[in-house]
């Protein structure tokens, strides 16, 4: 009885085993298809366990019947035979358990083969989206590489489209603002460029409004700036060749305004040899007034007023580029003249400031040269050691300390008497102002200094050699005169006696 129960427990143990231990999966990696298959496997295992339990019960009943028959036949046998019976039974049951264990091993190996076959198609069926959702931060080497996010792909595609679109686009500046308000003017403007090639779209930018409102609200309500008569436009063609043909319209007049046409992908470079800088402009100045002012100097290629990107109001300066280099010399002669004298479209009396346009490379070089000159000026006239200390002080103190650093005093190299500098501590202590012209020689006594300053007195006169005569007191002078008072002395003594008598009388009273 005990052996059959042990065999049934073994069968149940192997039936429920899932094979070798696998890595625990995360919560996000649970596959619903695999869960369903595992549930089916568990149901099949339970059915097999029930069948095996029924077989074990039938075998137990047969064994009990055999034991009862043997007990009836062998009542008179010896004790040794009774002892041998369980040994014989054990040998039979061991053979049976070996056969059952062999069957269990075959079932176990078959199960493993089925699980391996099921796992291979499951890995192939997993999509890229399921991999993204699972565990992006896991470091396991068995996981497949993650794909690029769809958002980044969309951004890259959008940028590539914009770059491709720029090859088909042109910029048109100084366009009349009637293009926005009047539909007929808009159709005429579009037809002007449609004659060159088919136009895909037209966009208007740099529209200035009179009130600080959202752009869509201000555009719908048509609250445009009264002193800003022009806008900029972007025209997209369907053919790249049409862009080159549209560039020929640069400088053409539409509704009384000279248009500036340029490519977006390959804009024309500014040639500083053919360009002039115009300053001292009014903030509300228009390009058309500059076209009229400088057209007398030669053929103008374009006029560009630098404007604020938010308000679309000018910053007070512009660039005028000519088609010929010689026109620049004539344009420089307009320096200091009023713009109202040169153009009829403006009443502004500001005097223009015209100069040659500088190249960007030369400006950068000039800035670098200025910085070098500033650095060299601070270290000019210094020794090698002082320059090294100066550079160390700059790195330690920073910009603020660098600005405050004026004089360098190295430790152990203080000012000395031989350097021709006055000892300020001694001069302040004596109350004497330091004399920059006075030079103190080493080893000179005080008497020698006085001789050097005042000379040696002679015959009792200062500076002539000898000693000075001591000044006499008033009594000594009276004795020298023979005790006779002079008129001046009597006058001086008279009021004194009167004063003394008045004092004595006041005391007696």
UniProtKB/Swiss-Prot annotation:
Residues 41-85, 136-150 have a biased composition (Acidic residues). Residues 33-114 form a coiled coil. Residues 1-152, 345-403, 419-509 are annotated as: Disordered. Residues 347-359, 426-436 have a biased composition (Basic residues). Signal peptide: none annotated. It is found in: Nucleus, Nucleolus. InterPro entries: Nop12_RRM1, Nucleotide-bd_a/b_plait_sf, RBD_domain_sf, RRM2_Nop12p-like, RRM_dom. Gene3D superfamilies: 3.30.70.330. One of its GO terms (biological process) is maturation of LSU-rRNA from tricistronic rRNA transcript (SSU-rRNA, 5.8S rRNA, LSU-rRNA). GO terms for cellular component: nucleolus. It comes from the Eukaryota. Transmembrane segments: none annotated. Residues 168-266, 274-359 form the RRM domain. One of its GO terms (molecular function) is RNA binding. Keywords: Coiled coil, Nucleus, Repeat, Ribosome biogenesis, RNA-binding, rRNA processing. SUPFAM superfamilies: RNA-binding domain, RBD (SSF54928). Belongs to the RRM RBM34 family. Involved in pre-25S rRNA processing. This is Nucleolar protein 12. The lineage of its organism: Eukaryota, Fungi, Dikarya, Ascomycota, Saccharomycotina.
